Amino acid sequence: MTYLLFLKMAEERATRPLNPERLVPDEFSSHQLLGLSGEVLEDTYNHILRGLASQPGVLGAVYRGAQNKISNPSHLKTLIVDYIDKENWSAADADVNGDAYEELLERSAGDTKSTADQYFTPRALIQAMVEVVQPTIDDRVVDPACGTGGFLLAAHAHVSRDAAGFTPPQREHLRTRFVTGVDIGATTSRLASMNLLLHGLGSISGDALIDQRDALIADPGDRWSVVLANPPFGRSSSTDIGGSADDGAAIYRQDFLVTTSNKQLNFLQHIIAILDINGRAGVVLPDNVLFEGGAGETLRRKLLTAFDFHTLLRLPTGIFYKPGVKANVLFFDKRPAAEQPWTRRLWVYDLRTNKHFTLKKNPLRREDLDDFVASYLPGKARDKRAESERWKSFTYDKLIARDKVNLDITWLRDESPEEADNLPAPEVIAREIVEDLTAALVEFEAVAAALEARAAEPEPDAPDE
């Protein structure tokens, strides 16, 4: 369905009165399907899919491997005539348009999410994160686990509000170089490319803005001034069926501070590596990043000393697809090397205690984050911040003195019992325990191997007297 919707919206871009842009060659456009039925419709649609797959550049990448999975021609005609073609998608309100298309994207990636444990980020949270990080036209924004591109589109929309005053080079930068996405999944990468093209980012003939690869495997060499991300939770680095690296395997990189199989810690290390000096990051990470010992403690010390780790947003449960997920948003800035710690004070906002959300009946809305955004004081000096019931600050000395630098900080009393609806199923809990134990065993084996190798080294000869 996303292929058909892309064709229809591409046709609308080609025929709009102002600044028409043809993304798809006319011979493969959606109007070629109108008025057809039966086998002729099916054959024509298959011809269009094959033709688009053979195109160079981003368009070919989007349609490569595309297949018509609607086996009944009458169903295909109904979908085209009664749903896709009767709507003028580009004339709809931009937010409604984006919601509709991204809902289709998420439906298309539904199997991927449930199978590979990928977490699509609530739009309200994306918007709030972008508002406080405040990307500008001078930035380059990257999401190393971009999914269908939600963070990238939100950052682009935020900066585009001032587009009327941009110079031609700035407009070109905004369209072709402002955002970059990386995702390991073939499906999600393709959907992200389609999403960006339909929102006016990139070009059919230009370089792809979405790179399909495992972001954790190697340092890309490039650096970005803004990182916005919600890396997939779980132990492997996969976010798509069939696209996994070795599940549970430790990642060895020279630019990493520690070697671990914990995917969230590795994504944090990767983001630390690709963030430019004075760059800003907003990253969604699970609770274990705040309290896990060993590699986790080492990275927390690094964040507090070599970075300005200034804000922590404790997220409520019930906002992700998997019940019971407990996560946070870490906001930090990369600073030049210095003798003194860069973090002076960590501000923590508790949006979790006594807050109850569900995906359908009580979803997280943008207004639920109004107080956090107001407390953050985007663009203003952080010494102007003022504490409140849910908003407290902690000095570097107090943080570094905590046992194992545990940053799992709470102070509000939880007055409600744990809701059964927010608890994972027993088999899910059991599987997560197995994954944690397996990952811990891998790390212990690596430590043991290193110790054995060190013990096997010959002792240096004693100096002559």
Set out the residue ranges of the language-model regions.
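Non-catalytic, mostly N-terminal accessory regions of nucleic-acid modification and defense proteins
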Residues: 1-137, 204-215, 314-317, 342-358, ...
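Conserved S-adenosyl-L-methionine
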Residues: 115-229, 234-236, 241-243, 250, ...
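Non-catalytic alpha-helical coupling and interface elements of nucleotide-dependent molecular machines
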Residues: 6-10, 89, 105-109, 157-160, ...
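Helical mechanochemical/support elements of P-loop NTPase systems and associated helical scaffolds
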Residues: 96, 100, 121, 125, ...
